[in-house]
């Protein structure tokens, strides 16, 4: 619960009052600790068994909070939802263009992938263009996500390394920028490294906050990660969805947003929620999940985004809450609702495959605040 604490915000977030970087300084205020609300309920025998608490913030490209559940200003670590914003310096600096990174490679910069062959090959390609190989990556190594996702042991004799890490695309991008800028590579994950200082400064601008107001922690891949109000995270993605029309990061946002929706298989992988949502979104939705119950979904046609935090990090509850928000906002048609129905996780099955309970969203979005 430590991450869900007070934070300084710019703007009060009320509908029509922007949270953006142009908000006057006198509107800075402190937000009280987050108020969580029940988002998803599990029932058994018709009786409530579990409640998953959390919060939702729906924000437009100007930073106005359009709708919410719980406290939209509650602070959460962003985890892998931050990757698209962490990739901005690579584009803003011209490094991506100088190295000739393809659209597919830009998509992998934003990925939490499965370590499938296409992911590994694309990470290798980014590194090769920077004149490096996987041995410089500082993300560490884990069993490829495809196997953990399916709850299966990897084949005997399978060799995996840093390229298979779900964050290898982000780290390959970090290395590429270091090479282009002439920065040292061996300590690129350190918070004081010029790369990470550039990332922090750019992320702060993208979400309309001051650097000193953004708490920092170290992510599972050893890179710095940042905590912020859900409304700020959603604001950054609403700007990403705005693309070329964004006045500060337009060209970079356009390239990243187009890459993510054109290559959702590279952003995630077989069987993953982000892949399912972006395919169902038909090029309009940008979706990114982060560890421990965080997700952001943005709509290009609306220049809006919503961020969700499930406080206990439960993934099935997160999926159910996301589908509910899509429905309540009217973003889905009947075909899309049918395509994503399995992600509601409505029936809870026992070891014999018999339905013994149900999981369902139990919240209604309220107006902006």
Ranges and model annotations:
Residues 51-56, 172, 200, 292-295:
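Short glycine-rich loop/turn motifs
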Residues 92-99, 131-135, 181-187, 193-200, ...:
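Bacterial peptidoglycan biogenesis and beta-lactam-recognition machinery
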Residues 23-34, 102-213:
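Active-site-adjacent helix/loop patches that line small-molecule binding or acyl-intermediate pockets
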Residues 23-73:
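Beta-lactamase-like hydrolase cores
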